[in-house]
């Protein structure tokens, strides 16, 4: 039976992934922005500012600031909910989908072994 990955291995994959994100061309995402991005892309929607704030246990203004940045980078967009005009829906974008695909590749390379992740392989945004 194969041994399960240790906490240190998970931390190593996280480090290699973050290093690759920092080294790539283009802007960085903060931890909060990345958390909002991943929540929108990995969990089924629809997503709202209110729902994201509750899911991540942060304030609605903090979610709004993160979405402002994700919108500037075309990684997510906001749209008024036609069913409830007081609510704003967060939508995925093609550029965000490509970023997630690249991020998965970087994480896979990092998980395969130390120093195997290509630092510049994520596209800049």
Predicted regions and their residues:
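N-terminal helix-turn-helix DNA-binding core of bacterial DNA-binding proteins
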Residues: 19-58
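Amphipathic alpha-helical dimerization/coiled-coil segments
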Residues: 17, 21, 101-125
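Canonical helix-turn-helix DNA-binding module
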Residues: 46-88
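Basic, amphipathic "hinge/linker" alpha-helix immediately C-terminal to the N-terminal HTH DNA-binding motif
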Residues: 82-103
């Amino acid at each position: 039976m194969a041994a399960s990955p240790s906490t240190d291995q998970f931390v190593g994959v996280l480090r290699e992934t973050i290093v690759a994100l920092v080294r790539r061309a283009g802007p960085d995402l903060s931890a909060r922005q990345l958390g909002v991005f991943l929540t929108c892309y990995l969990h089924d929607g629809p997503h709202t500012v209110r729902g994201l704030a509750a899911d991540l246990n942060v304030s609605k203004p903090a979610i709004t600031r993160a979405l402002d940045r994700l919108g500037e980078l075309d990684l997510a967009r906001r749209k008024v909910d036609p069913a409830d005009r007081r609510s704003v829906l967060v939508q995925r974008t093609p550029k965000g989908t490509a970023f997630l695909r690249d991020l998965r590749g970087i994480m896979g390379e990092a998980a395969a072994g130390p120093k195997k992740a290509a630092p510049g392989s994520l596209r800049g945004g």
